Regions:
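Short, solvent-exposed secondary-structure boundary/capping segments
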Residues: 59-71
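A generic structural signal for short, solvent-exposed coil/turn residues
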Residues: 45-47, 62, 84
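Compositionally biased, charged N-terminal/linker segments
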Residues: 1-35, 68-101, 107-119, 125-128, ...
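Short beta-strand-centered aromatic/proline hotspots
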Residues: 49-59
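Loop/turn positions that initiate beta-strands
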Residues: 37-41
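Short, charged beta-turn/beta-strand-edge "cap" motif at the junction between a beta-strand
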Residues: 30, 42-51
């Protein structure tokens, strides 16, 4: 999962993340429904690995979201990028229209926030962006939420001397054996229920 100020927002105003505690997204994000309690996650800032953990909780809430769109009447798509130095400030990736002010639209979305601070293990800078991309199941993907090849990722961490981080994560991942009140199957460590 990509976090931080360099996270591509495209047609929206961004997300509130604190990489070592929680990750935020909504129902407009590709793979939005694929994060669950018990999932192992690796979080990076598009430059380097920040850390790994296990999802402890996923909160859901309805919200109004401001979406930014291309103002070209023939386009109206959300694939816009804000430029840091060039003017006009925005460019549409779909129709190449350049503009200073995007069209805004309000949409009701489901917001999600996953908590993962209990097992957070900082591995800041241990793997660079190119190395992480090669460890994804779809190496060319540009999505913020991507599936990792976990055995390959674990091997890469172990080759850097961070094998203890993988063991810590393995110890925190629950076995899915009984139904909790939220219909998520969880076994509490040490056999308590």
């Amino acid at each position: 999962m990509a976090a931080g100020d360099d996270r591509q927002h495209g047609g929206n105003t961004g997300y509130d993340d604190q990489a070592d505690v929680y990750y935020s997204w909504d129902s407009t994000v590709n793979n939005y429904s694929n994060i669950h309690v018990g999932d192992t996650v690796a979080i990076w800032d598009k430059q380097r690995l920040l850390g790994v953990s296990v999802v402890e909780e996923v909160e859901e809430s309805a919200a109004e979201k401001v979406l930014l769109r291309c103002p070209n009447p023939a386009c109206g798509r959300s694939g816009i990028k804000q430029r840091k130095t060039k003017s006009p400030r925005f460019r549409c990736q779909d129709c190449a229209w350049e503009f200073d002010q995007p069209k805004t639209q309000i949409e009701t979305v489901t917001e999600y926030r996953s908590r993962h601070d209990a097992a957070w293990t900082s591995l800041e800078g241990l793997l660079r962006a190119a190395e992480l991309r090669e460890l994804c199941k779809s190496t060319k993907s540009q999505l913020s939420m991507r599936e990792l090849d976990w055995p390959a990722f674990a091997a890469a961490l172990e080759s850097t001397g961070a094998g203890r981080a993988i063991q810590r994560i393995r110890n925190r991942v629950p076995d899915f054996q009984f139904m909790s009140t939220d219909s998520i199957q969880v076994t509490i460590p040490s056999g308590h229920s």
